[in-house]
Amino acid sequence: LVGSEMCIRDRKKGVVYYNDSKGTNPDAAIKGIQAMNRPTLLIGGGYDKQSGYDEWIEAFDGKVRYLVLIGQTKEKIKEAAEKHGFHDIILCEDLKEAVKVCEEKAQPGDAVLLSPACASWGQFDNYEQRGDMFKEYVRNL
């Protein structure tokens, strides 16, 4: 997850933003969570491909401080997370709002990870566009 395309640092607050928009299903997104070595605000959700989210949520394993959800799947994922005892959940209308909420909630040393476990359709043309918009929103904070 490290590289110029994947990582943006907020020098004012000491927060690192990671673009793993390619994590378009729970299995791929688990790898993004596992790569985190700091408290993480996770942006997830998107188009519903009828995936199950239990294993993805189990991968939080104390790493995820907040789950910030967008898209068609936000309520479905919220219910699954709550079933697993995870309640630090924020529902947002879109990715722009999610990035802003993460910026407000993040503490020095935290990471913000876009690893949505869902497809981008319905909000974006593809995962590349979603990732590009994420980077733009972060730069404009």
Identify the role of each PLM range.
Residues 54-110:
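C-terminal helical cap/extension that packs against the catalytic core
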Residues 15-16, 120-123:
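A short acidic, helix-capping loop that chelates divalent metal ions and anchors anionic groups
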Residues 28, 76-79, 123:
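Phosphate- and divalent-cation-binding pockets in alpha/beta enzyme and binding domains
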Residues 122, 135-141:
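Phosphate-binding loop of NTP-binding sites
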Residues 4-64:
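Nucleotide phosphate-binding/pyrophosphate-handling subdomain across enzymes
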Residues 113-117:
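Short beta-strands and strand-loop turn motifs
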